[in-house]
Design a protein with these regions (language model features):
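N-terminal low-complexity, intrinsically disordered segments
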Residues: 1-31, 38, 42
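Ordered, soluble secondary-structure elements with a strong preference for glycine-centered loop motifs
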Residues: 1, 33-41, 95-99, 165-169
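Hydrophobic alpha-helical segments and helix pairs
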Residues: 30-72
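Short, charged beta->alpha transition segments
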Residues: 9-13, 69-74
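Long, highly charged amphipathic alpha-helices
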Residues: 42-49, 53, 100, 170-177
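Histidine/cysteine-enriched polar flanking segments
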Residues: 1-15, 53-58, 185, 208-217, ...
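Short charge-dense sequence patches
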Residues: 1, 46-58, 118-127
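Membrane-proximal, solvent-exposed terminal domains/tails of membrane-associated proteins
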Residues: 70-73, 77-96, 103-230
Length: 230
């Protein structure tokens, strides 16, 4: 807390203000699980040493309370950590040409990135959904010139998207257009043909998950959600 500014500020190497109160935080969970006793102890020890260095007073929560909270947070996150996919597969046995796939993806506004996936992004550059290969090869500009694949998969990472149902609608629209252009079929992960009713059910599930997150005060697609689901 800056004495001069009267506001909470992030401390950087070039900060010139004087601080009367400093708050430090530790992320309690991510996709690897809840924070453990060892990491928590190291964090608390570091805070003790920092306070001693500046002859300051320190307020710390009880370790067992933090660990209990971390486990509860991790359990909740695990319950809503869902990635939902829609596949477009070739049923004629000819395969999809990589050059045509790339053209269709780019025409739909998707960007090929270094992770081997096409990304649909919002106005801020955040990923809404991805398009990947069902085969072993990743998508790469050079590889796609000669690639032939039996199918592609569209994937939506539910906790990391602000408006999941809207992102899903766009994803399905692109998948349907691609299926029509390629002569493919929309199927789920078990290769069952996706009916309109099944697609509506998936959309409803996305909305339900994101509502649960909002109640837990983790806004889907927010900075907090991106930290927790990483």
């Amino acid at each position: 807390y800056g004495e001069g500014s009267g506001q909470w500020r992030t401390i950087t190497a070039h900060a010139a203000d004087r601080y009367s109160v400093v708050a430090a935080s530790l992320q309690l969970a991510d996709r690897r699980g809840a924070v453990g006793e060892t990491d928590l102890a190291a964090f608390l020890d570091g805070m003790h040493r920092l306070a001693q260095h500046f002859a300051g007073l320190i307020e710390l929560p009880a370790s067992h309370e933090v660990l209990t909270h971390a486990r509860a947070l991790d359990e909740f996150c695990a319950g809503v950590d869902v990635q939902l996919g829609v596949n477009v597969v070739d049923v004629a046995g000819n395969g999809f040409a990589g050059t045509k796939l790339r053209g269709l993806a780019e025409a739909a506004g998707l960007e090929l990135r270094g992770d081997g996936l096409f990304h649909a992004v919002d106005e801020y550059g955040a990923t809404l959904f991805t398009l990947g290969n069902l085969g072993p090869e990743i998508f790469d500009a050079d590889v796609m010139r000669t690639l032939t694949t039996a199918g592609v998969t569209f994937m939506l990472d539910v906790p990391r998207v602000a408006d999941g149902p809207a992102a899903f609608d766009r994803m399905v629209a692109v998948a349907r257009q691609m299926a029509q252009s390629l002569g493919g079929t929309l199927v789920d992960g078990q290769r069952h043909v996706l009916s309109d009713a099944m697609i509506a059910g998936i959309r409803a599930k996305i909305g339900e998950i994101q509502q649960q997150m909002a109640v837990y005060e983790i806004a889907p697609g927010s900075a907090r959600a991106l930290r927790l689901f990483s």
